[in-house]
């Protein structure tokens, strides 16, 4: 899985956008993604985690997480990065040392992390393992992982000043919601930012799932939605923006050179 954007805080720069400056439509924010497995970046395809292989990218050599993270953020002119910890998501131990190394190497990074958190306590435990750098971690709470409605409410009740501590990801695969806690039906408990994750579109060159995006938007029109999966080229980003997406999580199209570098 992989996995919306947050406005500028202090001196940190915003991720840049692919956008026509003459347009009055809000620009699309690109959030680059890395999928981490056993200490390296792998290529995600259709959410079939057991078949993932080390990334091969036009942007950099090798699959070292720091090298790949820097290349993606430079290409997107972004200080925001999403990471899916596949070790944790497949029942293993979260890669705290790898996450810490990325944060230490990129001191301006706002790091969105999905490690299959079942509850707020699990997220806090990973923060403690990462150490002081975890102040820059934005926790992703995914509908496929959250265990109860009570935990859904608890995860987004905690705040850091005026900043929400996490983002909700609404997950589905092949038309079926991955949602043991019933998150999809509880928009009153959603945070201000929600990811719409269609797993079979991830790395599949299949186009974005705009129907599901519109379905979620209808449930909560004021929520900032971030799509995930399916982007093939810049025209897909335009269509996603027109459908109401605030941002999109992207990996394969960046590694394959199908999206141009973002410039100021």
Model-derived features: where do they sit?
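Short linear motifs in low-complexity or flexible loops
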Residues: 3-5
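Hydrophobic faces of well-ordered beta-strands that scaffold small-molecule active sites
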Residues: 29-34, 81-83, 111-115, 139-141, ...
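Conserved anion-binding
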Residues: 36-53, 121-202
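Short catalytic helix/loop segments, enriched in acidic residues and glycine
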Residues: 48-70
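N-terminal active-site wall of soluble small-molecule enzyme domains
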Residues: 72-75, 79-130, 210
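Alpha-helix-loop-beta-strand connector modules within alpha/beta enzyme cores
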Residues: 92-115, 155-166, 205-227, 231-232
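Catalytic cores of alpha/beta
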Residues: 111-133, 186, 213-220, 225-247
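Glycine-rich phosphate-binding active-site loops on the catalytic face of alpha/beta enzymes
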Residues: 132-151, 198-203, 230-236, 243-263
């Amino acid at each position: 899985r992989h996995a919306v954007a947050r406005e500028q805080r202090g001196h940190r720069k915003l991720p840049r956008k692919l956008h026509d400056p003459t347009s009055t439509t809000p620009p699309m924010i690109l959030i680059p993604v890395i999928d981490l497995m056993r200490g390296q970046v792998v290529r995600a395809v259709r959410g079939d985690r057991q078949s993932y292989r080390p990334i091969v990218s036009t942007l950099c050599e090798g699959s070292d997480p720091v090298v790949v993270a820097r290349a993606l953020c430079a290409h997107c002119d972004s200080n925001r990065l999403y990471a899916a910890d596949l070790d944790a998501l497949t029942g293993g131990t979260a890669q705290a040392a790898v996450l810490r190394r990325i944060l230490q190497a990129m001191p301006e990074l706002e790091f969105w992390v999905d490690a299959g958190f079942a509850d707020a306590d699990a997220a806090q435990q990973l923060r403690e393992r990462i150490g002081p750098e975890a102040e820059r971690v934005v926790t992703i709470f995914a509908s496929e992982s959250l265990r109860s409605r009570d935990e859904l409410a608890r995860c987004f009740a905690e705040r850091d000043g005026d900043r929400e501590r996490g983002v909700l990801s609404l997950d589905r695969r092949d038309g079926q919601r991955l949602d043991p806690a019933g998150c999809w039906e509880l928009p009153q408990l959603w945070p201000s930012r929600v990811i719409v994750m269609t797993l079979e579109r991830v790395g599949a060159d299949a186009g974005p799932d705009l129907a599901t995006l519109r379905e979620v938007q209808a449930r909560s029109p004021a929520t900032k939605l971030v799509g995930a999966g399916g982007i093939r080229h810049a025209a897909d980003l335009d269509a996603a923006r027109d459908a109401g997406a605030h941002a999109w999580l992207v990996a394969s199209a960046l590694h394959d050179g199908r999206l141009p570098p973002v410039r100021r």
